[in-house]
Amino acid sequence: MAAAVSAKLVKELRDKTGAGMMDCKKALAATEGDANKAVEWLRQKGIASAEKKSGRTAAEGAIGSYIHTGARVGVLVEVNCETDFVARGDMFQSLLRDVSMQVAACPNVEYVTTDEIPNEIREREKAIEMGRDDLEGKPEQMKEKIVEGRIGKRLKELALMEQPFIKDSSITVADLVKQTAGKIGENVKVRRFTRYTLGEGIEVEENDFAAEVASMQNAG
């Protein structure tokens, strides 16, 4: 049994269905490592992938918002689905809230997916990594491989869909979206988001406290 439910099988099932890692492990354990039966098991549980639905147009949906405690961080998120009926449903609205909270909790995230990250940013990150002192003297091929791994990690840090879900770190936001799509039976897509932080971008003048006190004394 342990040999059948290998990490490789879990990864293959996860890639195929979009289900979370723990769900894939449970499915494979329940079906004695049979990948096809595991897919059916996930479908019966309502957590199979929306793979077949992903090509359909998601033009409906809703814009969600989240204001963090203290009103210092605010978020707007657009999530799309196929029908207005689904957009009004509890499951879709729950996803909308969760994604909004996720954006609020991830200040470094700037893009929905890694595919959206511009080439100039990729090239900039590569130039930075190639210049690291710890790579000095290493063979070029090895250096390229190390840099590629570091860049991949860095780009994932910038993408919302790659983040561990704040309520269940065993899955990513992408997994959450796929699971929700599988349950509601429609294509679901996070289209865009905006994160506002109070005072961001405002240059605050730093006063010289000692000079300020001295000037007050002189004025007195």
UniProtKB/Swiss-Prot annotation:
Region (Involved in Mg(2+) ion dislocation from EF-Tu): 83-86
Keyword Mitochondrion: no
Domain of life per record: Bacteria
Entry GO CC: cytoplasm
Keywords on record: Cytoplasm, Elongation factor, Protein biosynthesis
NCBIfam families the record matches: tsf
UniProt xrefs under PANTHER family: ELONGATION FACTOR TS (PTHR11741), POLYPROTEIN OF EF-TS, CHLOROPLASTIC (PTHR11741:SF10)
Similarity remark: Belongs to the EF-Ts family.
Name of this chain's protein: Elongation factor Ts
Lineage: Bacteria, Bacillati, Cyanobacteriota, Cyanophyceae, Synechococcales
